[in-house]
């Protein structure tokens, strides 16, 4: 089983991602974090293989705060893959920063919020 932790600002979006992953491959065991403050512990407890986090311009979901969580998770679980989700239409500058984080090797992948559930699942499957 591949364990995936999903930490999204929008609970409906988190549910959609979890459902898409489960429907794509029954090998995915998906856990949803209730809040960013609980994400690191959830990743450690579940021994997550992949952490998917939404990045927005709002507190607790800002890129800087997400990178802190990334650092905490990687310190305890270096093999955990980090994937950031960003809305490239409403957050153009933030989307550029997320893309640069990937280029700089700080994250394993990023996904734009406008992609299909099937594509998201396929990308996660390749990690």
Model-based region annotation:
Residues 1-4:
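Extreme N-terminal starter segment of soluble prokaryotic enzymes
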Residues 7-8:
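Conserved acidic carboxylate
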Residues 17-21, 68-72, 93-103:
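Short, aromatic/basic amphipathic alpha-helical patches
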Residues 34-50, 58-60:
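Acidic, metal-coordinating helix/loop segments flanking the phosphotransfer/catalytic sites
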Residues 51, 82, 109-110:
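Two-component signal transduction core modules
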Residues 86-126:
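Output/docking surface of receiver
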């Amino acid at each position: 089983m591949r364990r995936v932790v999903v930490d999204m600002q929008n609970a409906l979006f988190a549910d959609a991602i979890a459902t898409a992953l489960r429907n794509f491959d029954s090998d995915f065991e998906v856990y949803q974090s209730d809040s960013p403050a609980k994400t690191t512990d959830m990743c450690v407890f579940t021994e997550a293989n992949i952490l998917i986090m939404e990045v927005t311009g709002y507190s607790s979901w800002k890129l800087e705060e997400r990178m802190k969580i990334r650092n905490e998770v990687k310190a305890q679980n270096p093999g955990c893959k980090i994937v950031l989700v960003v809305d490239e239409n409403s957050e153009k500058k933030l989307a550029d920063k997320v893309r640069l984080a990937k280029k700089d090797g700080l994250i394993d992948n990023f996904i734009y919020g406008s992609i299909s559930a099937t594509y998201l699942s396929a990308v996660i499957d390749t990690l």
